[in-house]
Swiss-Prot record:
Highest rank taxon of the organism: Eukaryota
Primary role: Alpha-conotoxins act on postsynaptic membranes, they bind to the nicotinic acetylcholine receptors (nAChR) and thus inhibit them. Through its two C-terminal domains, this homodimeric protein would bind to two nAChR allosteric sites, located outside the nAChR C-loop of the principal binding face and at the adjacent binding interface in a clockwise direction. This toxin specifically blocks mammalian neuronal nAChR of the alpha-7/CHRNA7, alpha-3-beta-2/CHRNA3-CHRNB2 and alpha-4-beta-2/CHRNA4-CHRNB2 subtypes.
Source organism (scientific name): Conus rattus
Family: Belongs to the conotoxin D superfamily.
UniProt free text on domains: The cysteine framework is XX (C-CC-C-CC-C-C-C-C). Displays a mini-granulin fold, a structure composed of two short, stacked beta-hairpins connected by two parallel disulfide bonds. This newly described fold is derived from the same cysteine connectivity as knottins (ICK fold). The name 'mini-granulin fold' comes from the structural homology with the N-terminal region of the human granulin.
4-hydroxyproline modifications at: P55
The protein's name in its UniProt record: Alpha-conotoxin-like Rt20.1
Amino acid sequence: MPKLEMMLLVLLILPLSYFSAAGGQVVQGDLRSDVLARYLQRGDRDARECQVNTPGSRWGKCCLNRMCGPMCCPESHCYCVYHRRRGHGCSC
């Protein structure tokens, strides 16, 4: 595969690692905080509503809804519960 085609392929696939369609989660790195802020400020999203998991680490996860353990709840009215033997989960 020629170099230009490979570069275009990488540029097309790269954004998929930052936005997950299942739950609206955003994965951020230290150098991409401005991209995250712009994403959150579009429409009705606000950076103040972003809850970042693993603060201080190189990679973190931003939840637009409530965070429950290592995951984001799918809707804003959900709350976090603990299930015996299954761990934390969202109850909606």
